[in-house]
């Protein structure tokens, strides 16, 4: 299995069977950039995780999991919840598994299969039919898009870093802060992310809202942090995107 030692030292034990589960209960969970030789299926049963790639950010709520192919550089932060679950899949596994990065919507069967493997830490032997079903359900699971492509233009680096503290401004305000025209900013965003800036900003706000809710923030607190004019405006925005209210969505994290 892949295990964690101090200072983000990752080790692979090649003796494990086709699939091995790893559960972390570290309250200060934050793994820096690293990669693995195995494919991974990662989820937080009662919290959410933020996965950062070199040019993309993904937020994974507890009703979803992320599939990471081998050798992809990534960092992981767990937000809320009591544990993080990772399944490692050997590249030599004899069953069909996803070969691309994807976010899976979990059903009750897939959740049960993941729990069966991940929490059996003292039992490395699983019946082949169980592993086959786990791989099949992972491959066939419906997909969802909770990702945010990141621009790489050097003019935007300082601004992107500031988003750790402040929500992205509307285009006119942001362009003045950067010192570029709205047309230039719009062109950069569409070229490098495939999204218009306002679309990108809405996606950022949505993912940040999910992170805040997972950390126990109130709906009103989310609205204030994300600079919505009213709590009602935030609720409307969230419901348009997620087809449920923020209060209802918070139940995933309870």
Regions found by a protein language model. Give the residues of each.
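Ligand-binding loop in jelly-roll beta-barrel domains
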Residues: 72-101
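Short hydrophobic/aromatic patch on the recognition helix
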Residues: 63, 185, 189, 233-234, ...
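Terminal helix-turn-helix DNA-binding modules in bacterial transcription factors
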Residues: 191-231, 235, 251-254
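Short acidic-glycine-tyrosine-enriched beta hairpin
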Residues: 55-70
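Generic protein-terminus/edge-of-domain signal
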Residues: 1-48
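Amphipathic alpha-helical segments enriched in hydrophobic/aromatic residues interleaved with Lys/Arg
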Residues: 95-164
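A short, Lys/Arg-enriched amphipathic alpha-helix from helix-turn-helix/homeodomain DNA-binding modules
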Residues: 142-178, 195, 199-218
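…primarily DNA-binding HTH/wHTH and HhH modules…
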Residues: 2, 7, 236-254
């Amino acid at each position: 299995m892949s295990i964690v030692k101090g200072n983000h030292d990752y080790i692979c034990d090649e003796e494990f069977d086709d699939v091995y589960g790893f559960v972390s209960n570290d309250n200060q969970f934050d793994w820096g950039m690293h990669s693995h030789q195995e494919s991974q299926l990662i989820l937080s049963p009662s919290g959410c995780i933020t996965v950062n790639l070199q040019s993309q950010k993904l937020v994974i709520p507890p009703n979803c999991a992320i599939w990471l192919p081998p050798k992809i550089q990534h960092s992981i932060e767990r937000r809320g919840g009591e544990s993080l679950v990772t399944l490692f899949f050997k590249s030599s596994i004899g069953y069909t598994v996803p070969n691309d990065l994807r976010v899976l919507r979990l059903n009750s069967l897939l959740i049960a299969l993941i729990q069966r493997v991940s929490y059996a830490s003292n039992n490395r032997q699983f019946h082949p039919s169980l592993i086959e079903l786990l791989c099949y359900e992972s491959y066939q699971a419906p997909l969802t898009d909770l990702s945010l492509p990141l621009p790489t233009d050097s003019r935007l680096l300082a601004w992107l870093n500031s988003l750790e503290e402040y929500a992205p401004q509307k285009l006119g305000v942001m362009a003045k802060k950067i010192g570029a025209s709205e047309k230039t900013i719009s062109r950069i965003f569409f070229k490098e992310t495939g999204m218009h800036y306002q679309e990108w900003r809405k996606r950022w706000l949505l993912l940040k809202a999910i992170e805040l809710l997972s950390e126990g923030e109130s709906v009103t607190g989310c609205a204030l942090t994300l600079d919505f004019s009213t709590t009602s405006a935030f609720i409307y925005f969230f419901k348009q995107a997620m087809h449920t209210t923020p209060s209802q969505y918070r139940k995933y994290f309870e």
